[in-house]
Amino acid sequence: MLIFTVFISLFISSFPLSQGAINHSEKNTFVEGQSIYLVSDEHPYYNLLTSPLACWYTDKDQSLQPLLLVQGQTVSARQQDFISKFTSDSTIISIGFTPKNYAVDQTFVGSPLLLSYQLAKDYFPKSDKALILPIDEIIDTYTLALLSTPLASYLHMPILLYNPNQQQHQQLFLTLESLNASSIYAVGSKIPSQFQDSYKLIHMKNTQDIQELMLSAIQNQFKKINYVTLTNPKDVSPLNLLDENNESIQIPIQHTSLYVLGKKFVLSGSDTVTKKITIPQGIHKYSTKITMKEITSVFPNDGSTPVFLSATLTDPNGRTISYGHSPGYRTNATYIETLITNHSGEYTLTISLFYGYRGGYFSLRGVSDVKTILEIDQHMQTLNDAHYPLISDLSQNAAYLTSAHGGIMIADEKFSLTDETYLEIADHHSTGPWYDETLQEYNNEKVNFIISRLQKNLSLLKNHDLYNGYVNGSGWLALLGDTNMIPMYYYPSNQTHLAERGLPSDNPYSLNHSLSPGRVISYTASDTSLLIARTLFYEQVCGPPTPEDEWHRKFNFVFGEGFGETGGFFHQIPYANKLESYGFLTTVYGDLRNSRQAAERLNVYTDTNYVEYLGHGDWFWFTPSIYGFNSIGQSIGAVQVRS
């Protein structure tokens, strides 16, 4: 066996796997009955109103309950699975909607403005203080409200909304009267004049006022901070549509192919089809979904046969501008999308299909046989500007995520890559910086701007004796946004033979490795909220780690060839040694080209909770065994995780 292993066997029976229950101070975690909040994604303020209900702190107690963002009034199967595993006697509460497919115990519906008064009365019969947030249709207003929402959790007070463009606020003052409130924390530059006359007023006019008050509350409540969330509030804004067109066509494809001694022999038909697409002048978001229909093959059609369906879109100059592969999307389907800015002409969509078994490395061999219909659904949205979130509404999760970790938030629509300046720079371009290196300079300027904003906000921590503990300790930085809303930095690469350009990285956000940055994203904002819930309540859902079930604390390190050995010896082995002091069971594997089947038999990738891999591969799939007749059938892709 040519696999290289280093076993570190120090055993410690208990260790923290996650930060599940909030424990930012020595308070007791107090839960008055288990509740799960299902929140509509149709308006971002529903999530803001619910956050201080699901997460709150007092001088002696604290409470954290799951909050799940629901897309389109339908509770997903994965969300239902989480609910069933969380606890059997939870009270299920929906905010802002009535689920179409799931029975709940209590429902609160209505506009965010009116709902804020109802929730305050129901959850805070008496409160000497309240957080008053503005609500209108302007992103700047939402930004201020989003930034200040964690304060309601830290000071355990209700959120009440007001429209700064209206003169009458009778319902607001009636609610304050019923709460018996004496102090109000008001956000916004135009607040009702009655606040000054009738209450002790703490006025937060701008983002700096909010951050200073937030940091004071954190210092008083927790004495430390180890979490900051970066997000872009503009991701709740829809595309600025000028026109929209859909087209669906079906193209038959059939082929039988053999792979012998590394060469492909097409015995019948063709494994590739092309389609010409005419793009007019203007700004367009173009997307295509390709799905296989009515599959006929000598191989089973029960999901067990490996399928590689890929699509490549090239511009009029023949340059790749978008690529999709079924292992990264769905079984029997793939998807591509791109932003085209004033680059009209004839584009080419190329679709390739493999359906069968294939393996080997130096001597590729295999067979593919399929007859199917490719359904091509094209969607072209003509836009007035370049605003283009890849994953909409992620910022809706920011308040709850931040509050659960006792942190602060940094939010600004100026973090967007696809702004007005980008539209000028990307004129006559058909893709983003990932395929076009000429766009990377502006992309990196935007990253540096975000970093400067991060540093400016972190400097405020010094005024509250929180700075050193954050940047010199285990400070976490959550990047809650896609790479158009919070772009990655592109390092230069000499791999010019690849269609992709540069090496994207979030490392600059670490501030020279003084912070631990990570993207908190999934396919949708709803999926992301579920990811957050699974993380916060990991032990409650999966059970606490026990000596009998060591899977919880196993951490496997794998390094491959092609300079992967350097990372294995100088990073992974020392890091594994460090982790053992926290109770992890660690093993370091050197995965050579001809040892992958051995790694598979040793369950290197499956019999462990954590895996760190240094080697070649794609983000969306990995082949643990590159030899054997069916190596691609043994691959693990994002599609398996998703389904």
Task: Describe the function of each predicted region.
Residues Q19-K27, A499-R501, N512:
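N-terminal intrinsically disordered, low-complexity tails enriched in polar/charged
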Residues T5-I8, I12, P16, C55, ...:
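Compositionally biased, low-structure terminal segments
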Residues F7, I12-S14, T87, G560, ...:
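Intrinsically disordered, low-complexity serine/threonine-rich segments
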Residues G20-T274, P280, T296, G303-D315, ...:
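Alpha-helical transmembrane segments and their helix-helix packing motifs
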Residues P158-N163, N180, Q194-E294, F299, ...:
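Cysteine-dependent hydrolase recognition
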Residues F15-P16, L176, L579:
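Hydrophobic alpha-helix position signal
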Residues M1-A21, Y46, L144:
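Secretory targeting signatures
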